[in-house]
């Protein structure tokens, strides 16, 4: 009975994050989507949609880079809503700057959003899940998790770091019954940003040539549902026509 547990989705944006939130809510979880406080209205819209469809949801405005904010968020969910069984770390932090135009401020902020915030999230999740020797901690990666593209020094280095955090946690927490996995999203996703910025890429949607958020969410649920004798710790997702 998943309704006895909560699922936290950090970075519950309009596409993938929302789809993952809805997916876990559809299976009965009390979902707790989180975004930056300035996006609380969008979170409320997401929660209302889930509630209207018969699920349970409460949105939280959280700065995932702030240690106290993350600690308080996890404590509230664990103690006032339901034991935390699933945590998905899904913030986007993608920026493009030639190396000479990459300021120290940009580099640090991207690292804070993609790597440091992931560490804080994983650590707090582990604290609560270890008490029960169960749970899933999932990190969303990208093409940049695997290779540093030209102009992506800040983003790639941060995503490399997040992948390392995930690998380390998987090895440490697996024997404790906690499933840690890293999802490499290798391709464009069906989002408003892609539609507006890369219309030629978005046109591939007619041929299933860009990743669909609901299909991504299906995979997260599948990995969460795996038997512990055959866990996946890293996988990559891309459209069938994507070159790799």
Residue ranges of each PLM-predicted region?
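Rossmann-fold cofactor-recognition segment
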Residues: 50-68
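Conserved glycine-rich Rossmann-like NAD(P)H-binding loop of the short-chain dehydrogenase/reductase
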Residues: 28-44
């Amino acid at each position: 009975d998943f309704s006895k547990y909560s699922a936290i989705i950090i970075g519950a944006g309009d596409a993938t994050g929302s789809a993952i939130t809805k997916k876990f809510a559809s299976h009965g979880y009390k979902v707790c989507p989180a975004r930056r406080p300035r996006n609380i209205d969008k979170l409320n819209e997401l929660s209302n949609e889930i509630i209207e469809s018969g699920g349970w949801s409460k949105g939280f405005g959280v700065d995932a880079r702030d240690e106290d904010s993350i600690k308080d968020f996890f404590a509230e969910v664990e103690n006032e809503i339901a034991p935390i069984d699933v945590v998905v770390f899904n913030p986007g932090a993608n920026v493009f700057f030639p190396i000479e135009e990459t300021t120290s401020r940009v580099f640090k902020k991207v690292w804070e959003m993609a790597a440091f915030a992931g560490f804080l999230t994983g650590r707090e999740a582990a604290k609560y899940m270890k008490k029960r020797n169960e749970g899933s901690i999932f990190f969303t990666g990208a093409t940049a998790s695997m290779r540093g593209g030209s102009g992506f020094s800040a983003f790639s280095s941060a995503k490399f770091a997040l992948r390392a955090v995930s690998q380390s946690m998987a090895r440490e927490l697996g024997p404790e019954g906690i499933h840690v996995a890293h999802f490499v999203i290798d391709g464009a996703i069906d989002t408003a940003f892609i539609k507006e910025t890369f219309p030629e890429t978005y046109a591939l949607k007619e041929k299933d040539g860009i990743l669909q958020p609901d299909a991504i969410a299906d995979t997260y649920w599948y990995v969460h549902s795996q038997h512990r004798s055959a866990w996946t710790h890293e996988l990559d997702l891309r459209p069938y026509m994507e070159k790799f």
